[in-house]
């Protein structure tokens, strides 16, 4: 066993050229293998060199082709630019021509329209002028009438009215200052107009010294005078109110009493307020009743 081990360790250098197939190669075979390896390496190197040359030649060709393409594109752009400019010029000329033709057509249409409507417009304008003049005249006359109507009440804003009342067989004269447009002033003017012809009749029927017919006329005139001179009667309340008003005017305490009555403690103001409340309540109840009565 020891000898066998020593032999195995001594042959360790020969293991480098050991082939597992079991056959031994000669030196010629080894040289051929080496040559084949060298040939394979050279072929691979040539292949890589060829690839590099091809790669270098391809961009050059591409550059040449791109240069040609760029030149062709520039030429095409120049040609297209020239053609587009010519087209733009033609379009501009055509647009100007169309605009001028449109303007001419519009002018012709307008002239024909004016010729058709010329006479009618003149007649309409003359009628409008006449209407405007009439309206101006009426408007100028209306303010004058209104001014006259307004000036009349300004001249006689207040009118004094004297009324005669009969209180216990005594004549009581009451004078008031009332607006000219009030109902009292109008009624007073009507009464005075009615009394004027009666006074003329009584003055014309003066009794001469003798005659039966004359007595009759005097009797008739006295009757008319009595009828015309019939006086209104005055109640005690109206007489007391009249006396109170005259007293306030004589003493000059009307404003003081009005200020006092407007205060919180004024009896008249409270009474007026309560009357307004009652009237309002009555109106509300009336509206409710009417709404219920409607179908």
From Swiss-Prot:
Positions where Phosphoserine occurs in the chain: 80, 83-84, 112, 212, 246
Modified residues (N6-methyllysine): 215
Keyword match Phosphoprotein: yes
Biased composition (Acidic residues): 1-18, 25-43, 70-93
Domain of life: Eukaryota
Region (Hydrophilic): 174-213
Annotated segments matching region Disordered: 1-155, 188-219
Coiled-coil stretches noted in the UniProt entry, renumbered to this chain: none
Compositionally biased region (Basic residues): 49-65
Subcellular location: Chromosome, Centromere, Kinetochore
Comp. bias intervals (Basic and acidic residues): 145-155, 188-197
UniProt keyword terms in alphabetical order: Centromere, Chromosome, Developmental protein, Isopeptide bond, Kinetochore, Methylation, Phosphoprotein, Ubl conjugation
GO BP of this protein: cell adhesion; chromatin remodeling; fibroblast apoptotic process; negative regulation of fibroblast apoptotic process; regulation of cell population proliferation; regulation of cell shape
Biased composition (Low complexity): 120-130
Domain BCNT-C: 214-295
GO cellular component: kinetochore; Swr1 complex
InterPro entries given in the database record: BCNT-C, Swc5/CFDP1/2
Pfam families named among the record's database cross-references: BCNT
Glycyl lysine isopeptide (Lys-Gly) (interchain with G-Cter in SUMO2) cross-link site: 146
Function: May play a role during embryogenesis.
Name by which UniProt lists this protein: Craniofacial development protein 1
Species this chain originates from: Rattus norvegicus
């Amino acid at each position: 066993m020891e000898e066998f081990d020593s032999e195995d360790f001594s042959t360790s250098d020969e293991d480098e050229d050991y082939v597992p197939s079991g056959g031994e190669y000669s030196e010629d075979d080894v040289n051929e293998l080496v040559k084949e390896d060298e040939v394979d390496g050279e072929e691979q190197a040539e292949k890589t060199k060829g690839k590099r040359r091809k790669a270098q030649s391809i961009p050059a060709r591409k550059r040449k082709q791109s240069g040609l393409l760029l030149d062709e594109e520039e030429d095409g752009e120049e040609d297209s630019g020239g053609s587009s400019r010519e087209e733009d010029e033609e379009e501009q000329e055509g647009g100007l021509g169309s605009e001028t033709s449109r303007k001419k057509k519009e002018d012709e249409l307008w002239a024909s329209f004016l010729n058709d409507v010329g006479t009618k417009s003149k007649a309409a304008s003359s009628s409008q002028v006449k209407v405007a003049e009439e309206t101006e005249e009426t408007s100028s006359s209306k303010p004058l009438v209104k001014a006259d109507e307004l000036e009349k009440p300004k001249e006689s804003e207040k009118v004094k009215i004297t009324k005669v009342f009969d209180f216990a067989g005594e004549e009581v004269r009451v004078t008031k200052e009332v607006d000219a447009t009030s109902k009292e002033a109008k009624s007073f003017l009507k009464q005075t107009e009615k009394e004027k012809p009666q006074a003329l009749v009584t003055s014309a029927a003066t009794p001469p010294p003798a005659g039966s017919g004359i007595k009759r006329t005097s009797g008739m005139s006295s009757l008319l005078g009595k009828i015309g001179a019939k006086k209104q009667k005055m109640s005690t309340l109206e007489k007391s109110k009249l006396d109170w008003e005259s007293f306030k005017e004589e003493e000059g305490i009307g404003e003081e009493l009005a200020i006092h009555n407007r205060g919180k403690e004024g009896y008249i103001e409270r009474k007026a307020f309560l009357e307004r409340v009652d009237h309002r309540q009555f109106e509300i109840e009336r509206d409710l009743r009417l709404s219920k009565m409607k179908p």
